[in-house]
A protein has these predicted regions:
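Canonical Rossmann dinucleotide-binding motif of NAD(H)/NADP(H)-dependent dehydrogenases/reductases
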Residues: 27-62
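Catalytic loop of short-chain dehydrogenase/reductase
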Residues: 38-47, 118-153, 161-203, 215-217, ...
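Conserved mid-core segment of classical short-chain dehydrogenase/reductases
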Residues: 88, 92-97, 101, 105-106, ...
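Short, flexible catalytic-loop segment of classical short-chain dehydrogenase/reductase
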Residues: 208, 212-223
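A conserved structural motif in NAD(P)-dependent oxidoreductases
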Residues: 238-249, 260
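Short C-terminal tail/terminal secondary-structure segment
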Residues: 254, 265-292
Length: 292
C-alpha cells in the first residue's frame, strides 16, 4: 500500500513538472455554477475574478446595473459563454429576487456568488467625513453593504452544500483613508454583515467571506481624488514593495470560490502585498525623520 501511495505521489509530481502548474491545476471550477454581481469593464477587480473562474471551467452568470452598463458587460459575459446576462439594481428587492429565479431556471443550484457592488455619491467622498450627507450615507450603506444581505437571502435556497459567497472590501474599512470617507463606513458594515451571514448560513454548508484587495488602477478607482498617491503609498508600505495586480486578486477569488477554501468562512482575506500588516515602511520613517 505504501509503495502504491509513493508511486502515485511521484507520478503527480511528474505531471506537475511536465505540464506546468497552470495546466496541472486547470478545471478547478469545472462543473461549478455561479453568478457575479458588479462586473463593469475589463479593468476592474470583478473582471479579474471572473476571468480566473472562467479559465478554470466555471459557468458564470452576470448582472449589470442599467442600460448604460449593458453595452460594457454584455460583450464580457458573451466572451465567457454566459447563459444568463441580466439587469439588476441591488437596491430593489424584486430585481434581486428575479435574478435568482432565473438562475434557478437555468442552473438549478449554485456553487458561488460574488458580490462586487459598491457606490457612494462623489460629493460624499470628498472633503471632510464630518460633512457626509444623510442621503449619501443611506445610499452608500444601502448599495454597498445591505445589498449583500439581500443577495444572500435570495441566494440561500439555491446554494449547494459546500458553496461560497464572498464580497469585495478594502482596507478603508478599518483605517481612515483620504477621499474614501463614507465608503469606509460602508465597507466596515459590509465586513460586519459578512460575519453574521457566515453564522446564519454556515450550518447549511455555505461559506461567506470578504476579499480585501490593495489599491488597483481601475476606471472606478481613478475617479478617487489622490488615487495615484494612494498607489505610491501602498507600494512604499507593502512588505513586497509592489501593488497587487488583477491576476493576484483573481487568484484569491478563485481560492474563495473553489473547494480550496472549504474550511474558510467569516474571514476577511487580504490580498494587498502585505500593506495592511505594516505600520510604516523604512522609507516612510526616513521621510518623517527628515521632516523633523
Amino acid at each position: 500500500f505504501l509503495f502504491l501511495y509513493c508511486y502515485e505521489f511521484i507520478f503527480l509530481l511528474f505531471l506537475k513538472r511536465r505540464l506546468g502548474k497552470e495546466e496541472f491545476f486547470m478545471d478547478l471550477m469545472k462543473g461549478k455554477k455561479g453568478i457575479i454581481f458588479g462586473v463593469s469593464n475589463t479593468h476592474g477587480i470583478a473582471y479579474g475574478i471572473a476571468k480566473q473562474l472562467f479559465d478554470e471551467g466555471a459557468d458564470i452568470a452576470f448582472t449589470y446595473a442599467g442600460e448604460a452598463m449593458e453595452k460594457r458587460v454584455k460583450p464580457i459575459a458573451e466572451s465567457m459563454n454566459a447563459k444568463l446576462i441580466m439587469s439588476c439594481d441591488v437596491t430593489k428587492e424584486e430585481e434581486v429576487e428575479a435574478v435568482f429565479k432565473e438562475c434557478e431556471k437555468i442552473y438549478g443550484k449554485l456553487d458561488f456568488v460574488v458580490h462586487a457592488v459598491a457606490f457612494a455619491p462623489k460629493e460624499d467622498l470628498m472633503g471632510r467625513f464630518v460633512d457626509t450627507s444623510k442621503e449619501g450615507w443611506d445610499i452608500a450603506l444601502g448599495v454597498s453593504a445591505y445589498s449583500l444581505v439581500r443577495v444572500c437571502r435570495h441566494a440561500e435556497p439555491l446554494m449547494n452544500e459546500g458553496s461560497s459567497i464572498f464580497a469585495l472590501t478594502y482596507l478603508g474599512s478599518v483605517l481612515s483613508v483620504p477621499s474614501y470617507n463614507v465608503m469606509g463606513v460602508a465597507k466596515a458594515a459590509l465586513e460586519s454583515a459578512m460575519r453574521f451571514l457566515a453564522v446564519d448560513l454556515g450550518s447549511k454548508g455555505i461559506r461567506v467571506n470578504c476579499l480585501s484587495s490593495g489599491p488597483v488602477k481601475t476606471l472606478a478607482s481613478m475617479g478617487i481624488a489622490g488615487f495615484s498617491k494612494m498607489l505610491k503609498a501602498a507600494t512604499m508600505r507593502a512588505p513586497m514593495k509592489r501593488n497587487v495586480s488583477l491576476e493576484d486578486v483573481g487568484k484569491a477569488g478563485l481560492y474563495l470560490a473553489s473547494d480550496l477554501s472549504s474550511g474558510t468562512t467569516g474571514e476577511v482575506i487580504y490580498v494587498d502585498c502585505g500593506c495592511h500588516s505594516a505600520y510604516a515602511s523604512a522609507e516612510e520613517m526616513d521621510v518623517i525623520s527628515k521632516a523633523e
